[in-house]
Amino acid sequence: AGMRVELVGWDVSWQDAVVDDALAAELRALGPVGRYAVDIQRIVREFCRAETKIDGFDLPDPVAMCCAIDETVVARDLHARVDVHLGHGDARGQTVVDHLGVTGRPVNARVVLRADRARFVAMLRDALR
């Protein structure tokens, strides 16, 4: 009630927050924090290679945090109705975004559609120095 709701979905992460091998090497070279941050992603990197076919590893939580901290990271957004499916079965917990306003229900969230990759990477570098 009265709290601003912002959704940064996983799709933003795999579009704009993937760390490929070249960027991973650059981040590791920043020092012990950068090295640690990249090294703990080893299993995620293997999962991404095998399952999601992402060339690197994605960072959903860091990109969401960067969007919350700095408005300039948000490259494209939408104000829409968002609901969470609370029923049973495979869709339980799924977020449903009314992109077209067809439900007629009031807007209740800002949905981030794309992040500014360059700004995100700059913030990531700064945090890992």
Give the predicted meaning of each segment.
Residues 4-129:
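Conformational coupling and interaction surfaces
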